[in-house]
């Protein structure tokens, strides 16, 4: 078997109005004939966690090529910046088209730019042994590292997700799943795709990223992409399981400033004050935010200003403490 190589490829290109040309690239680590896997990031332009994960994976793979090039048995593709225009402008969607790119799949090769890009990505990813689509939260909320799975595909994906070294597996019912996402489109056509979400928009949380990197490397080793004797970081996190029946949404009862009283990713008790909503114009507390159940606080508001109905937290109800 020949030693592993690395190359940068352009998988999508289109002419822009002012004699410019947009090119979307991927980094490919070429090994042997074992399975092909991929990591996708930057579908939303305000989500940067996945870009750093791709960097950390590239660092690890560069070192593997230097020290043990024969240990890469398959091919690894990193797609760190799908929505380049959104990333350039700190815009969640695709600028000009005002489109959420993750609502354009599976796309159309003859459609407008969002659909063409979606179709090109589908073509590039189809047939992979596993795709990991990495997202951050928006700028308003902080999420613990988690995998989100449509229950339609849970038999296939949950066993893989358990090895991803994340803290939560959130199973979504079919009624709450958007079918125009890259993950749903890939899973529907037989290419396994996990959605990982963590952190907060427009920020990087390095320890979350390293946690996910360890999980991805362990899964790649399980799939035979990496040699059995390769040393990978320990995957020490055991995920909790959440579904639509035990996830509780806490929405603001009034507008104001949300001041958290509980720490993110901690055990909370039923009735415990998780935060308060106050007014900058007076000294009164406008509203207390209390946990409806015993559970774990896995989503917490990062941006303090809230309107009535704004999401402030999510609690996963369960018995006992967090292990």
What are these regions (language model features)?
Residues 1-323:
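Structured catalytic-domain cores with a bias toward divalent-metal coordination
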């Amino acid at each position: 078997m020949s030693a592993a190589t690395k190359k940068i490829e352009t998988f999508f290109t289109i002419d822009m109005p002012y004699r410019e040309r947009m090119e979307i690239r991927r980094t490919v680590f070429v090994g042997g004939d074992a399975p092909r896997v991929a990591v996708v990031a930057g579908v939303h332009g305000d989500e940067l966690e996945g870009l750093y994960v791709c960097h950390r994976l590239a660092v690890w793979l560069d070192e593997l090529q230097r020290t043990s090039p024969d240990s890469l048995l398959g091919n690894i593709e990193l797609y760190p910046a799908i929505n380049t225009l959104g990333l350039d402008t700190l815009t969640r969607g695709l600028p000009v088209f005002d489109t959420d790119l993750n609502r354009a799949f599976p796309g159309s090769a003859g459609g407008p730019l969002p659909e063409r890009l979606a179709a090109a990505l589908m073509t590039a990813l189809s047939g992979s042994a596993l795709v990991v689509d990495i997202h951050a939260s928006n700028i308003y909320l902080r999420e613990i590292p988690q995998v989100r799975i449509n229950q339609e595909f849970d038999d296939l994906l949950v066993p893989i997700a358990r090895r991803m070294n994340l803290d939560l597996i959130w199973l979504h019912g079919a009624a709450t799943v958007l079918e125009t996402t890259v993950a749903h489109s890939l899973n529907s056509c037989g290419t396994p795709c996990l959605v990982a979400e963590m952190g907060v928009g427009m920020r990087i949380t390095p320890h979350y990223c390293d946690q996910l990197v360890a999980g991805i490397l362990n899964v790649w080793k399980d799939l035979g992409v990496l040699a059995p004797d390769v040393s990978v970081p320990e995957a020490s996190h055991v995920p909790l399981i959440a579904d639509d029946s035990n996830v509780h949404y806490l929405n603001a009862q009034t507008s104001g400033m949300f001041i958290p009283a509980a720490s993110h990713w901690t055990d909370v008790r039923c009735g415990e004050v998780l935060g308060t909503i106050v007014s900058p114009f007076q000294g009164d507390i406008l509203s207390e935010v209390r946990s409806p159940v015993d559970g774990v606080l896995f989503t917490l508001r990062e941006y303090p200003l809230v309107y009535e109905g704004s999401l402030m937290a999510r609690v996963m109800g369960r018995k006992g403490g967090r292990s």
